[in-house]
Design a protein with these regions (language model features):
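Conserved GNAT-fold acetyl-CoA-binding loop/helix
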Residues: 26-47
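An N-terminal domain-start capping segment
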Residues: 32, 36, 58-68
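Short, contiguous strand/loop micro-motifs
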Residues: 28, 33, 51-52, 94-95, ...
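A short helix-loop-beta-strand connector motif used in the catalytic cores of GNAT acetyltransferases and
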Residues: 48-61
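Acyl-donor (CoA/ACP) binding surface of acyl/acetyltransferases
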Residues: 1-23, 63-196
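Short, intrinsically disordered/low-complexity patches at protein termini
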Residues: 39-42, 50-53, 94-95, 154-157
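Hydrophobic, helix-prone linear segments
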Residues: 8-9, 45, 49
């Protein structure tokens, strides 16, 4: 059973997503267009995405095991023929530590398995190290675009890279191996402490 599940974004999700769009860290790390948009304009935009724009972009709701909303993922720049898209996500502040990484994995898994996307375009603003360390960001990026985004009064540099299905699986396998190594070290340390 998956730790985070993905479901379709609905009208009931709009107020929660608008609150996320207005959150300060979200604005600094992704986009701050919500600062200059009214609630009515933001609501209309979300409803338009739900009703009319599924061929070019989609919003997904990320849920904890009990069904509560922990965040959202959205895909843009969809090319159905080439099976590519850009994936973005935002986790609600109170769930970032507990669900952040699992939410990202769930979103990637969903768009690959359910929407048949083979290549995902990733964009992360260079200062945003909430999920990817600065070193990993430098290693992954293929394009570095200075002055890419203007958020909360500053020009931001963006890093872009693509990730195929095979590359994503290798990353997941490496994470699983690291978790196993850590668990084994903890077990070994606990066994030594118990024997003493």
């Amino acid at each position: 059973m998956s730790f985070v599940t993905v479901r379709h974004f609905t009208e009931d999700d709009v107020p929660t997503r608008i609150a996320l769009l207005r959150e300060s860290r979200f604005q600094a790390n992704l986009t701050d267009f919500a600062v200059v948009s009214s609630d009515d304009d933001l609501t209309a935009g979300q409803f338009r995405t739900i009703a009319e724009e599924h061929d070019t972009k989609r919003i997904l709701t990320l849920c904890a095991p009990g069904g509560e909303t922990v965040g959202f993922a959205w895909i843009t720049s969809i090319d159905w023929r080439a099976q590519t898209c850009e994936l973005s996500f935002g986790v609600l502040p109170r769930y970032r530590g507990a669900f952040g990484a699992k939410a990202v994995i769930a979103a990637h898994t969903h768009i690959r398995r359910e929407l048949n996307m083979r290549v995902v375009i990733n964009q992360v603003l260079e200062h945003n190290t909430m999920l990817v360390s600065a070193g990993d960001l430098t290693d992954r990026r293929r394009v570095r675009c200075a002055y890419d985004s203007y958020t909360v009064g500053e020009w931001r540099t963006a890093c872009y890279w693509t990730e195929t299905q095979e590359e994503a699986q290798r990353t997941l396998d490496a994470l699983d191996e690291r978790r196993r190594e850590i668990a084994e070290r903890i077990r070994a340390t606990s066994a030594k402490a118990s024997a003493s």
